Structure formats: structure tokens, C-alpha cells
Design a protein with these regions (language model features):
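A short acidic, helix-capping loop that chelates divalent metal ions and anchors anionic groups
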Residues: 36-42, 140-141, 257-258
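N-terminal Rossmann-like or analogous alpha/beta NTP/dinucleotide-binding catalytic cores
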Residues: 36-124
Length: 278
């Protein structure tokens, strides 16, 4: 049930992989897609920290053999806790063990919890291990803390809790060419509409091994209203149109704003680029 793939999830994955290897079994990470919140509250703001592809890459790198995706639809939402364990986990998937957090609930109406999973699982040969929260000096490590940090533009905290920089991905598409006209051609990403949007502003980061000065926001200098992600890759030449670009966000340099003139804008972009190189 690993949506954010952060330090707590990595701790769970490490334990699962260790148990699986000791038992000579494959280690599988599991996740629901879409997030159950999306099913029960479809109008809630999007908050996904990782895409399915990102999760798969991260857990494979950690040593998992595969990722299991439960499609959270009406059928799964109406599956009783007993059927989830017996019919799905044991009979259909043949699992011999599961590891969850102590706050894990499942089944129709959240009818199952870790006690139900442990007792009913044991009766059907499924060993359930429950792990407590992972904490640091700021409290329990959770996806909510990471979201709050990103919404505040606090990349350092997000990076520490994720154990990696927060990443946005998107296909490079044609934009207004304003950056090119100013001498700073940008890769304009079509962002995942379901992903969390960090605080608008100018960021330092990296893409394709190049330092990046990136703008996330609505481009107020040009009177924009739609969210954009524009990345200037330092010392890069080439055509990225149609490519999928992965952009790491290292630091929020400043808020986005409009300028009195194009000259002022160019001067600020140059300063942002210099800061991104530091």
C-alpha cells in the first residue's frame, strides 16, 4: 500500500524483501490505483507523490521482484474484508505473507484492520506482520508531511523524507517560445494532471544530468492562468520535443512574479540560472 515510496514505505519494503528471501519467495510491493480517496471523493484535489511507473522503478531498485497493482473500483470497494483476505490474497494470488502499517484498513466499509488480517490470515496460512510508524525529530514520517513540505516549497524536508529529490515528469511539448526569445529556451512539460503540484515558484534541480532552473506556476509576467512546468537545462543542446523528461527539484529559489520590463525579467532569469549552478 505504498503510494509515496518514502522512508516509511522503504522500511516496510526492506522487511518484506528480507522475509521473502529468507523463505525463498518473490517479494512483491502492492499498491492501489487509483488511490481509494479518488474513488470515494473524486472531486478531492490531486495529491499523488509518485506515478505507478515511478513506484515500480523505486521498488525494483530496492530489490522487489514485482509490483502488484489493485485496481480500486466499485468491485474492490465492495469486497468484504474476509473475501479480500481469503478469495483475493490467499486463493487468487497465493500469498504466504504480508507486511502492513498498524493503521492499515481494508474491505467494504473498512471492515478489516490489522487484527482481522492477522487472525483470519493465520487461519488460511497467511502470515501478517504489522510494523509501527517510522519517526524522526519532526514526528511520524508520512505522505501527508511530504505533501505539506512540497506545498510550502520546502524541498529539503521532502528530499529527506523521500530519501531522494521530489520528481515531476512529463512529455516535452511546444510552448509559447517566450524563453527562447529571451535567450533561455525551456523544455515545457505536460505534467501528470493527477500528481501533486508543489508550491509555485522558481526551482533549482536536475534533468538528464544537467543543472536546471525551472518555473512551476502560471507565468504571471505574461498574464498566464494555466499551470505550467518550464525547465531550462544548463549547457544542453538538443531537441526534446516528444520525449518524457524527469525533473528533480532540489531547491525553491523564489516565488514567481511579474516584472516591470523584459529587461528586468531577463536579469532575474540570469540570476536564477546562476543560483541553479551553485
Amino acid at each position: 500500500n505504498c503510494y509515496g515510496s518514502h522512508l516509511r514505505h522503504q522500511t516496510f519494503a526492506g522487511e518484506a524483501i528480507a522475509q521473502a528471501k529468507a523463505a525463498g519467495k518473490p517479494a512483491i510491493s502492492a499498491t492501489f490505483d487509483p488511490h481509494p480517496v479518488r474513488f470515494f471523493a473524486p472531486d478531492a484535489p490531486w495529491f499523488r507523490l509518485t506515478t505507478l511507473d515511478q513506484r515500480q522503478r523505486l521498488f525494483e531498485a530496492a530489490g522487489a521482484d514485482a509490483m502488484l497493482v489493485f485496481e480500486f473500483d466499485a468491485s474492490l470497494a465492495n469486497t468484504t474484508a474476509e473475501d479480500f483476505i481469503v478469495a483475493l490474497l490467499v486463493e487468487r494470488l497465493g500469498l504466504s505473507g504480508v507486511i502492513t502499517g498498524e493503521d492499515f484498513t481494508f474491505g467494504k466499509g473498512r471492515g478489516g484492520n490489522v487484527d482481522v488480517l492477522r487472525d483470519l490470515g493465520a487461519a488460511h496460512g497467511l502470515r501478517a506482520t504489522t510494523m509501527g510508524p517510522v519517526k524522526d525529530e519532526g514526528g511520524v514520517i508520512s505522505s501527508s508531511r511530504i505533501r505539506d513540505a512540497l506545498k510550502a516549497g520546502d524541498c529539503a524536508t521532502a528530499t529527506r523524507l523521500l530519501t531522494r529529490p521530489f520528481t515531476v515528469e512529463g512529455v516535452v511539448q511546444h510552448g509559447d517560445k517566450n524563453g527562447r526569445l529571451l535567450g533561455f529556451p525551456t523544455a515545457n512539460l505536460a505534467p501528470d494532471p493527477h500528481a501533486l503540484v508543489p508550491a509555485f515558484g522558481i526551482y533549482a534541480g536536475e534533468a538528464l544530468g544537467h543543472r536546471v532552473a525551472a518555473s512551476i506556476g502560471v507565468n504571471p509576467h505574461y498574464g498566464g492562468s494555466e499551470r505550467r512546468i518550464e525547465a531550462f537545462l544548463l549547457d544542453f543542446t538538443g531537441d526534446l520535443y516528444g520525449d518524457r523528461l524527469r525533473l528533480e527539484l532540489w531547491e525553491r529559489l523564489r516565488e514567481e512574479r511579474a516584472f516591470a520590463s523584459e529587461d528586468d525579467l531577463v536579469a532575474q532569469i540570469a540570476a536564477d540560472v546562476e543560483a541553479a549552478q551553485a
